[in-house]
């Protein structure tokens, strides 16, 4: 099944909701970066959240970046997504081994530890919007919930989950974001809080084979759910040799000449998808000639 996001409203548009299945996204990231299970879970949660948040943006060229800088062994995470829910990301450290959490789960909170979440929205204006909040738990879903409440003043419930197979491949991944709009009635707020408090974890829903539509129906069915849109989402990197060449030009002729003088090919790595691009000495000479 291909990954996708469902966009919906409920309670006469007092609630807006997103639910996502992201198993292929997270497995693609795991394969690209060869991550250990706790890193797969951390990166997978941020990729899932990023895909849904990307789909919230209006402009075709809008770009969202989620960055976590942290003191834990993972070192940090970076995810970018566009309005079409194309998403990519990487961890600073791909292999982290930690004992399970007290609940017997992958200890993402310990892998991240203390840190800061930055949300950067580039909407083609002079300056991008930047919102920053401290990590609350390092479990990512709670950290995004806190970001929405403090930086965007939108009461939200974010749930993100990644479940692994014994062979360390991704069994299932997904999540939801449910938000109360400013005119939500007190009765709706109380009922929704009660409902969210009753549900099992999002991973157990996904593990049962529940689709994003079924997850939203379970959560919001009694509020009068209206599904608005089904958006495909995937792990996509837009790096090309031409784009990498532009990056090489930007380092300046002096450094470029030093590379040529070394008489060895150079290899440039894309952090997001881990693709390596090799440039021979002849190609480097050609680049410097064309940049004159």
Swiss-Prot record:
Keywords noted in UniProt: Chaperone, Cytoplasm, Disulfide bond, Redox-active center, Zinc
Protein name (record): 33 kDa chaperonin
Keyword Secreted: no
Domain of life: Bacteria
Function: Redox regulated molecular chaperone. Protects both thermally unfolding and oxidatively damaged proteins from irreversible aggregation. Plays an important role in the bacterial defense system toward oxidative stress.
HAMAP family recorded: HslO (MF_00117)
The keyword Secreted is assigned to this record: no
InterPro entries noted in UniProt: Heat_shock_Hsp33, Heat_shock_Hsp33_C, Heat_shock_Hsp33_N
NCBIfam families, per the entry: PRK00114.1 (NF001033)
Disulfide bonds: 237-239, 270-273
UniProt GO cellular component terms: cytoplasm
Biological process annotations from GO: protein refolding
PANTHER family: 33 KDA CHAPERONIN
Primary location class: cytoplasm
A GO molecular-function descriptor: protein folding chaperone
Post-translational modification: Under oxidizing conditions two disulfide bonds are formed involving the reactive cysteines. Under reducing conditions zinc is bound to the reactive cysteines and the protein is inactive.
Family per record: Belongs to the HSP33 family.
Subcellular location: Cytoplasm
